[in-house]
Amino acid sequence: MANLEVNFCGVKIKNPIVASSAEPTLNAHNMKKCIDTGVGGVIAKTMTDSEAMRELTTRSKWRFLNERHEVCQGKVPRCFSLYGRSGLALEPPEEFLPQIVETVEYAKDYDAVVIGSIASTALEGWVELA
């Protein structure tokens, strides 16, 4: 079998397939399912200390965009992109972080990496989350 390993910013990843921060990485259960498929890694849903930012997830927006990146009206054309903005982790950091830790432990058995994602509205929040 071919060696698909990549080195990204000093992090060795067994293959270049990474499940990014979206619904597939919304919780530990989903991240583990991604890892089970053989991905090289997962990027956990962004966690934040801001309740207002977490509420964005409840107002997710999905759109079909045509080749000119315009929102499709009516029939979806043959060439299109599915664009989504789904927000952040629903739980506050103290509830979401244990799910990331659980996923990191699970990922070790599959030689997969788990990458965290954080957001805050203040410098102090960024420092505390990091």
For the regions a language model picked out, list residue spans one by one.
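Active-site entrance/lid segments in N-terminal catalytic domains of soluble metabolic enzymes
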Residues: 2-13, 18-130
